[in-house]
């Protein structure tokens, strides 16, 4: 028997073992599913089922119900108090470090990226640092006269160069920032930069953009420039978006749990699953999948329940001496508001039902305060965004 024949024989044995393991696993899943169904049949009754569905319905109308830790700026695994304090100190230092270091040299031109406040995800063996950044192509089209195709081509190359240099600076090079920071954290460090197409998609980036606009302009932040910014930002119907979002979640949840309860009452005889090798969801997994999502389009569910897609309200507060006019008061304040910040379901209902007065949607606010000093004095920029 030659070596090739032995290798083929070994490969066939491994395939047979894998098939047997998969069949055993599917058999165990089938058994557990049947045991679970019998237990639920004994314990559930109609009154309990409807109470359970009503409770899920009330929880489902909260936009923040699916993601309660999205706004955390630091997620630390609490295994040691001293280590937790050290990680918090390092996180603050890294935040300042990234703001200073993210300056790239491309074609002998210096580009400074506008970044958001980083989000630190700590685990036992790794630290993942996530942040948003914004690229502006205004600097590359000053000498181009209304040639949109040329601007788009240059911007695409410019964006690719910056993205590749950014990844090399953070993660890939031997002397990258991640390798250096791993010596301080005593664990692997990785960066996850996320590019934003518009500066108004993050409050930190929008506030920093206003600060740069104020420092680079001879006229500072005039009302005309604020109006131009307002015209570029979207104006969405928050009532329609919120109601559509709530209806999508309610429909998905009611269909899913009604399908489960219906299958329990029918003893799983009405929804047979295809357990052939070509079916990726065969056996117990395929049966459970078909039961839960019988009346739902699985391809549209992620997009329907995706959060923070729409900006429905924003405000900008300018305080202090932003103007070049030296006679302006320090207490001068200008407030600009567009959209809404009150995402309450009962406001939009036709009937003021007492059951819905406490059933509100948590407001998703992103707030950033930035202070700086110019030649006339100190000023403050406060940006507040409401996303759904």
From Swiss-Prot:
Principal subcellular localization: mitochondrion
Keyword Transcription: no
GO CC list: mitochondrion; ribonucleoprotein complex; ribosome
Primary role: Essential for mitochondrial protein synthesis and required for the maturation of small ribosomal subunits.
Nucleotide-binding listed as a keyword: no
Family assignment from sequence similarity: Belongs to the universal ribosomal protein uS3 family.
Annotated disulfide bonds: none
Biological processes, Gene Ontology terms: translation
Organism this protein belongs to: Kluyveromyces lactis (strain ATCC 8585 / CBS 2359 / DSM 70799 / NBRC 1267 / NRRL Y-1140 / WM37) (Yeast)
Compartment(s) of residence: Mitochondrion
A Pfam match: VAR1
Protein keywords: Mitochondrion, Ribonucleoprotein, Ribosomal protein
GO molecular function: structural constituent of ribosome
Name of the protein this chain belongs to: Small ribosomal subunit protein uS3m
């Amino acid at each position: 028997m030659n070596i090739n024949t032995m290798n083929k024989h070994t490969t066939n044995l491994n395939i047979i073992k894998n098939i047997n393991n998969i069949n055993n696993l599917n058999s165990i899943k089938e058994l557990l599913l049947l045991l679970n169904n019998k237990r639920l049949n004994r314990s559930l009754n109609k009154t309990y089922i409807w109470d359970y569905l009503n409770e899920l319905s009330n929880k489902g109308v909260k936009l923040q119900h699916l993601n309660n830790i999205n706004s955390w700026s630091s997620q630390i695994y609490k295994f040691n108090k001293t280590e937790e304090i050290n990680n918090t100190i390092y996180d603050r230092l890294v935040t300042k470090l990234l703001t200073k270091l993210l300056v790239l040299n491309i074609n002998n031109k210096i580009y400074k990226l506008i970044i958001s406040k980083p989000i630190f995800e700590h685990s036992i063996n790794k630290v993942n640092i996530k942040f948003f950044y914004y690229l502006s192509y205004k600097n590359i089209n000053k000498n181009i006269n209304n040639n949109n195709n040329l601007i788009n081509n240059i911007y695409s190359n410019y964006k690719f160069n910056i993205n590749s240099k950014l990844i090399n600076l953070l993660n890939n090079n031997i002397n990258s920032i991640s390798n250096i920071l791993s010596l301080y954290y005593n664990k692997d460090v990785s960066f996850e930069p996320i590019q934003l197409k518009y500066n108004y998609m993050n409050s930190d980036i929008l506030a920093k953009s206003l600060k740069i606009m104020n420092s680079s302009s001879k006229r500072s932040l005039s009302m005309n420039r604020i109006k131009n910014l307002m015209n570029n930002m979207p104006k969405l119907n928050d009532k329609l978006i919120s109601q559509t979002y709530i209806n999508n979640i309610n429909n998905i949840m009611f269909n899913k749990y009604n399908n489960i309860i219906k299958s329990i009452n029918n003893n799983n005889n009405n929804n047979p699953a295809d357990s052939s090798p070509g079916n990726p969801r065969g056996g117990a997994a395929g049966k459970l999948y078909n039961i839960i999502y019988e009346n739902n389009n699985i391809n549209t569910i992620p997009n329907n329940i995706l959060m923070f897609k729409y900006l429905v309200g924003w405000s900008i507060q300018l305080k202090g001496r932003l103007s070049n006019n030296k006679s302006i008061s320090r207490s001068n304040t200008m407030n600009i508001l567009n959209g809404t910040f009150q995402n309450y379901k009962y406001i939009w209902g036709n009937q003021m039902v007492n059951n819905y007065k406490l059933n509100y949607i948590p407001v998703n606010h992103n707030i950033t305060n930035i202070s700086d000093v110019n030649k006339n004095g100190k000023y403050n920029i406060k940006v507040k965004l409401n996303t759904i």
